[in-house]
Amino acid sequence: MIPVLICVLISLSAADNDLDTLYPELEHSRTIYVTENGPQLSVMAEQSKVVSRRGGNATLPCKIQRDQSLAPNRKMRIKWTKLTSDYLKEVDVFVVMDYHKRSYGSFHGRVHLQGSSPMDASLVITEITLEDYGRYKCEVIDGLEDGTVVVSLDLEGVIFPYYPRLGRYNLNFYDAVRACHDQDAIVASFDQLYDAWRGGMDWCNAGWLNDGTVQYPITNPREPCGGKNTVPGIRNYGLRDKDKNHYDVFCFTSHYKGRFYYLIHPSKLTYDEAVRACQKDGAEIAKVGQMYAAWKLLGYDRCDAGWLADGSVRYPISSPRRRCSPTEAAVRFSGFPDKKHKLYGVYCFKGNN
């Protein structure tokens, strides 16, 4: 092996000599090592996810580390944006530079920097709404130096499948957004559906998610739901046409400020009578999302079927018992009966002013 290596080295040396003879004007190349200082400014977050609830406050961490060799710069710019679910664009939230500050859109008057030190760019969000859920980017620009970090704002809440009176698979994506909004909810994210599936959610009807995909969670594989011999998981139809394709939707809601209750009334009610009865009690007929929030987050339990705002009849069971969801805790669904039927009570909601 050594003689072979010596021969190779001799051959390479001879080749170099031949080049020198043939091209005397050719300069020998030299390897130049360039050293570069590391970034003089960096941005970091102590935690990548913050959990809060609707109506609460949250602080999204963003700390600046700045090289001492950098000259003081009063023009450092801090900008917070919210990333859309498909990451295709950013929504302005808050910008500050020197003494100039500005908040945008629905965040106006609800956001400010924590400012515990000159190097603290953490964002405080107050009176959190359902729409605040998502990922936020903190961007710091200091002269030619810049840095970014992304922090998620998660909400305590509950996910629920939904379809309207028209029946299953009647919602395009934009209809789905409106349907969830009408029920005091937003279209759920994949992360929220995944968490619900891990918690035991099993639902065999495909529904829209906020990224434009259509999926459904299966914990008990069976033939009509992706196949009996498949593993549990979230079945994924992928991205669908938001205008042309029609499915159900998975909605998400969180804590509310107010009181959800079953109205004690001397007789059963038609839908219109139910609406008026809640109004007479200083409330409004409750929405599906409010029932799910009361059931999941507050343990509300009532074995009386009652009208809700969308014309459906449901009742929430937290303690399974005979004749009241004997096998599991759930919001039981009695369908969309004729609104003239005088067969049900009503659930009302009274918000806190």
What function would you assign to each model-found segment?
Residues 62, 80, 136-138, 180, ...:
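Core motif of extracellular immunoglobulin-like domains
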Residues 108-151:
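Ligand-binding face of N-terminal immunoglobulin V-set domains in extracellular IgSF glycoproteins
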Residues 173-200, 262-266, 271-302:
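Conserved hydrophobic ligand-interaction patch in extracellular adhesion modules
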